[in-house]
Each structure stands twice: as C-alpha cells, then as structure tokens.
C-alpha cells in the first residue's frame, strides 16, 4: 500500500482517510488539475476472493450509475495497477460522527434537517435500485449549510447483482450498531435495510446514543433481533409524537412493517399530519427465542461463533438455546 508523499500515476498521496479489511483509503491530489481526490486501494490478496472481487466491480458500477450532488463520482479505475485502485470525487464536510462527539444530542430541528437531507439522497439511490447497506454516522458528511453527503459504497448492493456468499453464511456485512435484523440473519438486504439504518441514526441524533450497543458485537446484534430500545420520549422531552412514530416504524424488526423505501420515509418527514401515531404503542415482538445474557457475554462462546461467521453465529446461538 502507498504512503503519504508517494506518487501513483498522476496522483500524489496526501493523507490517510481510513482502512478496512479489503481496502485502504487516502486523500490525494490530481497533478493534472490540482484538485483533491480520494484514492481507494484494494488489497490484491483479497481480490483473489470472489466476494471481494465482485464488490470491487459493484462499487465501480454503482459509482458510475449514481449522478447526484452528495454522492461521490468514480473518476478513474485502475484495475491493472498494483495494487488496484479507484479514484473518487473528494467530498467536503464534517463527519456526522465528529459532530455527535462534540454535541451528542442535536436540537430537534437540526436532527430533522440532517435526516431529511440524508433520506432524500438515499431515496435517489433506491430509485436507481442501489442499497447502501452501511449507513452510519462515520459514512455521512455534513456541510455548514446542512447539506449532506454519503460516502463509502464499498458494500452497497445493486439490485439483481449476483450473490457472492452462500445464503445464510454471509460474513459481517455492515456495522453491528447499525445492522438491520435481516443483515444479521445473513440476508442480502434491500431498501428497508437502509430505512432501518436511517431510523437508528435519527434515534441517535435525538437520544445522544445508539439504540442498541454493547462491547460484545454478538450481544449488540442479538439486541436488534429481540430487544426494544428505550422510547425516545422517555429519554428526552420535547420530541414531537410524529417524530417518535417515524423512528418506531423505521426500526420495526420485520422489514415488511417498515417504510417501503427511503422515499416513503421522506414523505412522512415532510407530511407529519399523515403519520400514524398508533405506532407509538404497537408492540414489536422478538424475532427469536430469548438468549441467556451470561452465554452471549462469555468470550469463549463468542470467539467460537465468530469463527464460523457472524450471521451463522447468531443463528447457532439461538438454536443452542432452543434445545
């Protein structure tokens, strides 16, 4: 992988932006234009894996399909380089995670402005049959005027794309605090998966913390499947009923009970008088049988399950406890 100061073709690496299991991301400069760019270098050993190779090509296809301010365009693809890399449009803005670290609970109007702008971008993606599947504060940039950008389409899905893992045997595709129940269960996800993440994010903007969290990732995922978060109106006064109802519907465990897509969520945000307030008192039954807290907190148990894959881990744990 390159280092700051290195030149790759006609790009100069200026600073690291992040690193994941399959790629390292840097800010750079295009020497031809002088403009800042983002360079995403893929681990060539990972590209030998069919799943990583397919995701690389999905990201290229999706980047070329989406044309809207707030979504980074793919400017260049160097598949034959060593290591292979993409060049993406550089997006200005402050990470939503950084904003929340400075001010964990946002004023209600600001939270609604951010989530509405974000949901509108996601709705555009859904219109193009693209599902991000990893929406979280780290992947959202907010400018001083409140405009929003979405970054990192690395695990995004284009509807109809071939499956790259066995059904039910998917690895961790997403971030535990922001994963939808269907992702945890090894499903591919779709528009309702992004809707669930939008509900989680709005909850966090208003409550000051994610609805589900634990030092143990398996415990966090189990909470998504079976636990109910503390109601927003008990955490903080002054939250309108329609906002709490929108969050409740977006976060329903069963995807068919959520908003159909981000466009329907935007419509609810724009027309609060049409929001069904009965959602506030509607139960959301667990998706699996109760799991012993002592068991899921046992490090040896968790370690063994992670070895067989995240989605399978949750299902195996549930099966063991039903015996």
Regions found by a protein language model. Name each.
Residues 43-65:
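AlphaC helix of the eukaryotic protein kinase fold
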Residues 175-277:
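C-terminal lobe helix-coil module of Hanks-type protein kinase domains
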Residues 14-20, 25:
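Protein kinase glycine-rich loop
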Residues 77:
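Activation-segment/catalytic-loop signature of the eukaryotic protein kinase fold
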């Amino acid at each position: 992988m390159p280092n700051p100061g290195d030149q790759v073709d006609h790009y100069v690496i200026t600073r690291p932006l992040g690193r994941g299991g399959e790629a390292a991301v840097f800010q750079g400069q295009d020497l031809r234009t002088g403009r800042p760019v983002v360079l995403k270098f893929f681990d060539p050993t990972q590209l030998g894996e069919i799943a990583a190779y397919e995701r690389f090509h999905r990201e290229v296809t999706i980047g070329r399909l989406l044309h809207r301010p707030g979504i980074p365009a793919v400017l260049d693809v160097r598949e034959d380089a060593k290591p292979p890399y993409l060049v993406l449009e550089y997006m200005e803005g402050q990470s939503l995670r950084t904003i929340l670290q400075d001010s964990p609970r946002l004023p209600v109007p600001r939270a609604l402005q951010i989530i509405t702008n974000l949901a509108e971008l996601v709705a555009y993606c859904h219109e193009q049959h693209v599902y991000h599947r990893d929406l979280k504060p780290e992947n959202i940039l907010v400018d001083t005027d409140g405009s929003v950008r979405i970054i990192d389409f690395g695990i995004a899905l284009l509807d109809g794309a071939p499956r790259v893992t066995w059904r039910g045997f998917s690895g961790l595709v997403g971030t535990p605090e922001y994963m939808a129940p269907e992702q945890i269960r090894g499903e591919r996800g779709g528009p309702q998966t992004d809707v669930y993440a939008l509900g989680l994010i709005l909850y966090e903007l208003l409550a000051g913390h994610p609805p589900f969290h634990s030092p143990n990732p398996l415990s966090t995922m189990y909470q998504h499947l079976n636990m109910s978060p503390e109601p927003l109106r008990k955490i903080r006064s002054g939250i309108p009923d329609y906002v709490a109802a929108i969050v409740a519907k977006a976060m329903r465990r069963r995807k068919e009970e959520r908003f159909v897509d981000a466009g329907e969520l935007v419509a609810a945000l724009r027309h609060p008088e049409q929001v069904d307030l009965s959602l506030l008192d509607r139960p959301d039954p667990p998706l699996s049988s109760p799991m012993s807290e002592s068991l899921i907190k046992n490090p040896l148990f968790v370690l063994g399950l992670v070895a067989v894959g995240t989605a399978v881990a949750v299902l195996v744990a549930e099966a063991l406890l039903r015996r």
